[in-house]
UniProtKB/Swiss-Prot annotation:
Source species of the chain: Mus musculus (Mouse)
Expression tissues: Widely expressed.
Database matches in Pfam families: CSN8_PSD8_EIF3K (PF10075)
Statement: the UniProt record of this protein carries the keyword Phosphoprotein: yes
The protein, known as: COP9 signalosome complex subunit 8
Gene name as annotated: Cops8
């Protein structure tokens, strides 16, 4: 996606977020409609604003939660984000049939999560098992490997290892198709699958603290 289009989308989502917040504040009795709650909760997740997402979830009346299963679905995505469970984020997003008002936000969240995962792997690893990498970015193995080869990474079909390249400074927030790494690191011995995903999770926590 071109950077200009991403910027336009980001502006639109930011504007929609402001509108939803105002609608909640101005709602009779302080109780907004389910569509407003759904969009607002999803937008907070897209902004990675977990504090506001949690506060919103707590103040949504239980009766509205019970009568609108989509709200619980959105929050289940938020729980995966909170747990830094990248594979779980994609699985949970894909498991739900979202409404027309929420679907574009969830698609944007999935894409943003994928770009973030690509960037994190490029920072944290000199080599990673292709299957683990694919799970982390939420793509089939073949598609994930093809994508990184187009970005100048390397892949070994014999060992099924992906060899990332370190990103240029300041490129983490740009579109993946404009993400051009600089240096080529030397490969290191692989570590077991579960340990790799755990290490990535720890690295995410390190970057956020």
């Amino acid at each position: 996606m071109p950077v200009a289009v991403m910027a336009d989308n980001a502006f639109s989502f930011r504007k929609l977020l402001d509108q939803c917040e105002n609608q909640e504040l101005e709602a009779p009795g302080g109780i907004a409609t389910p569509p407003v709650y759904g969009q607002l909760l999803a937008l907070y997740l897209l902004q990675n604003d977990m504090n506001n997402a949690r506060y919103l979830w707590k103040r949504i009346p239980p009766a509205i939660k019970s009568a609108n299963s989509e709200l619980g679905g959105i929050w289940s995505v938020g729980q995966r984000i909170w747990q830094r469970d990248f594979p779980g984020i994609y699985t949970t997003i894909n498991a739900h049939q979202w409404s027309e008002t929420v679907q574009p936000i969830m698609e944007a969240l999935r894409d943003a999560t994928r770009r973030r995962a690509f960037a994190l792997v490029s920072q944290a690893y000199t080599s990673i098992i292709a299957d683990d990498f694919a799970a982390f970015v939420g793509l089939p193995v073949e598609e994930a490997v093809k994508g990184v080869l187009e970005q100048g990474w390397q892949a070994d079909s014999t060992t099924r290892m992906v060899l990332p390249r370190k990103p240029a400074s300041g490129t983490l927030d740009v579109s993946l198709n404009r993400f051009i790494p600089l240096s080529e690191p030397a490969p290191v011995p692989p570590i077991p699958n579960e340990q790799q995903l755990a290490r990535l999770t720890d690295y995410v926590a390190f970057l956020e603290n």
